[in-house]
Regions:
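Positively charged, solvent-exposed patches that mediate nucleic-acid binding
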Residues: 1-106
């Protein structure tokens, strides 16, 4: 299970983004916890409905489950240009970010 309760967003975001596109910004740093911690930021101004925000958070968490055993902190920031109902576009965007995070943290 990916943990997010004790991640320090400011520490991770203080670095440059690992990857970015029109949908998301992805930040990551190595940690000494031995497990992956994932933080997700979806501004209320971008997606008003809480149910839709939570659906998107579940999709993001699901995409990063395979990194669970990695010792990295990841923060994903939604930029608000993706159509929230276009699952294929969101999924391909998250795959792109995951690939870049894996490449830079090895």
């Amino acid at each position: 299970m990916l943990r997010s309760a004790d991640i320090d967003f400011n520490k991770v975001i203080s670095n440059k983004p690992i990857s970015k596109d029109k949908n998301f910004l992805a930040y990551s740093t190595k940690n000494n916890k031995g497990t992956c911690r994932l933080g997700v930021s979806i501004p209320k101004s971008k997606i008003k409905n809480a149910t839709e925000r939570n659906k998107l958070k579940r999709v993001i968490r699901h995409q990063f489950l395979e990194l669970e055993s990695s010792a990295i902190d990841i923060v994903i920031v939604y930029r608000g240009t993706a159509n929230k109902y276009d699952a294929k576009l969101i999924s391909s965007s998250l795959q792109f970010h995951k690939k870049n995070i894996i490449k830079t943290t090895e």
